[in-house]
């Protein structure tokens, strides 16, 4: 599989094809002969990293969170996107008895409502996906009760999102003596610290699942009910 990947990159990825055309004396079959890739190279000319067998406008445009530095724009084929979602359903959600038909909520930074808005809703609901999308940009002490009302109205079974945003919402609920029970809370994009986990578990009366992964789809890991990764 590695050799197939190296062969494809050498012949079909413009960035690497240009590299190996210049250094023909080196064997591309040996991984140690490949150049170390840095983010600046990708951000400078992202089109050089798209397989020539694909049309950029027919690919899914994603981006990294920038947890370790500069975020990246990525282009992913739709088969890989489907596999990614299937893996998440099977490996993460199913372990916590979360069905693919369960309504769910996500906290993210998409601007689903104007940033200056001071009155609800601070969310949108996707009926096709049974998804409640909550804006991370409006979570504050003055809006906590509004978020709780949205959770009660749409009754999601799990919550996914940025660790810090979920922690902030959990803390607000605790300060107002409120609890909203879920099957699980799944954190992403940021590390999960013990003090955050304690508040999230208390506010949502459920286990917290920490995930580690990359939008680049290089690797993925998550915590299991037994506490192991």
Question: Where are the regions a protein language model picked out?
Answer:
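Nucleotide 5′-phosphate-binding alpha/beta core
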Residues: 1-63, 69-103, 110, 149, ...
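Short, solvent-exposed polar/charged micro-motifs at secondary-structure junctions
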Residues: 41-44, 114-116, 219-221
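Short, flexible, solvent-exposed loop/turn segments with mixed acidic/basic and small polar residues
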Residues: 62-63, 122-124, 176
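Basic, gly/Ser/Thr/Pro-rich low-complexity segments located predominantly at protein N termini
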Residues: 71-74, 113, 194, 218
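A short secondary-structure junction signal
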Residues: 74-76, 116-118, 171
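Loop/helix-junction capping segments adjacent to catalytic residues or to phosphate/diphosphate-binding pockets
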Residues: 82, 113-114, 141, 194
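Conserved AMP-binding loop of ANL adenylate-forming enzymes
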Residues: 93-125, 134-137
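Active-site glycine/GP-rich loop and adjacent strand/helix microenvironment
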Residues: 126-229
């Amino acid at each position: 599989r590695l050799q197939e990947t190296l062969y494809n990159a050498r012949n079909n990825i413009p960035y690497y094809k240009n590299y190996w055309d210049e250094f023909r004396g080196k064997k591309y079959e040996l991984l140690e002969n490949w150049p170390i890739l840095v983010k600046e190279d990708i951000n400078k000319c992202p089109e050089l990293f798209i397989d020539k067998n694909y049309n950029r406008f027919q690919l899914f445009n994603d981006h990294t969170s920038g947890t370790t530095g500069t975020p990246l724009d990525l282009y992913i084929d739709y088969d890989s996107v489907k596999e990614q979602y299937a893996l998440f359903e099977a490996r993460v959600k199913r372990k916590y008895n979360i069905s693919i038909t369960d309504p769910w909520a996500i906290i993210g930074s998409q601007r689903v409502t104007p940033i200056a808005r001071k009155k609800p809703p601070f969310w949108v609901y996707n009926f096709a996906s049974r998804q409640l999308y909550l804006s991370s940009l409006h979570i504050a002490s003055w809006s906590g009760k509004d978020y709780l009302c949205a959770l009660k109205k749409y009754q999601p079974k799990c919550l996914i999102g940025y660790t810090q945003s979920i922690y902030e919402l959990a803390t607000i609920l605790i300060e107002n003596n409120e609890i909203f029970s879920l099957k699980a809370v799944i954190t992403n994009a940021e590390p999960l610290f013990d003090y955050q986990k304690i508040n999230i578990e208390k506010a949502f009366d459920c286990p917290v699942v920490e995930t580690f992964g990359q939008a680049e789809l290089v690797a993925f890991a998550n915590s299991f009910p037994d506490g192991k990764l």
